Swiss-Prot record:
Protein name per UniProt: Phosphoribosyl-ATP pyrophosphatase
Family: Belongs to the PRA-PH family.
Broad class of the protein's primary localization: cytoplasm
Its EC number(s): 3.6.1.31
Localization, UniProt: Cytoplasm
Annotated keywords: Amino-acid biosynthesis, ATP-binding, Cytoplasm, Histidine biosynthesis, Hydrolase, Nucleotide-binding
GO MF annotations in UniProt: ATP binding; phosphoribosyl-ATP diphosphatase activity
Lineage: Archaea, Methanobacteriati, Methanobacteriota, Methanomada group, Methanococci
GO (cellular component) term, any one: cytoplasm
InterPro entries the UniProt entry points to: HisE, PRib-ATP_PPHydrolase-like
Catalytic activity entry: 1-(5-phospho-beta-D-ribosyl)-ATP + H2O = 1-(5-phospho-beta-D-ribosyl)-5'-AMP + diphosphate + H(+)
Gene name linked to the record: hisE
Matches recorded under Pfam families: PRA-PH
Pathway membership: Amino-acid biosynthesis; L-histidine biosynthesis; L-histidine from 5-phospho-alpha-D-ribose 1-diphosphate: step 2/9
Entry superkingdom: Archaea
Organism of origin: Methanococcus maripaludis (strain C5 / ATCC BAA-1333)
Length: 96
């Protein structure tokens, strides 16, 4: 299984099942608007960290912060009810 798909599936499962102590549960369990706002703040924060790492030409930090950015973007997508398959289809459309 593709590692990104596996991570996305785990995020979706945690949003649904709400296991105690889960970071995903922590940032997605407020009322929908507040949760989405929190997630959006994290996406913005992580995007800024990727930019700073890139400006410093720090490959290790770019990779680390990009993983955080992709993870939080996946949380936002899953919280918004967007499936991995829908996202994949959008990428396929763009490959033409």
């Amino acid at each position: 299984m593709n590692v990104l798909k596996e991570v996305y599936s785990t995020i979706e499962k945690r949003i649904q099942e709400k296991p105690e102590g889960s970071y995903v549960v922590k940032i997605t369990t407020d009322d929908k608007k507040t949760a989405v706002n929190k997630i959006c703040e994290k996406v913005g924060e992580e995007a800024a960290e990727v930019i700073l790492a890139a400006k410093d030409n720090n490959k290790a930090e770019i990779i680390y912060e990009s993983a955080d950015l992709i993870f939080h973007t996946m949380v936002l997508l899953a919280k918004s009810g967007i499936t991995y398959e829908e996202l994949s289809e959008e990428f396929k459309k763009r490959m033409k």
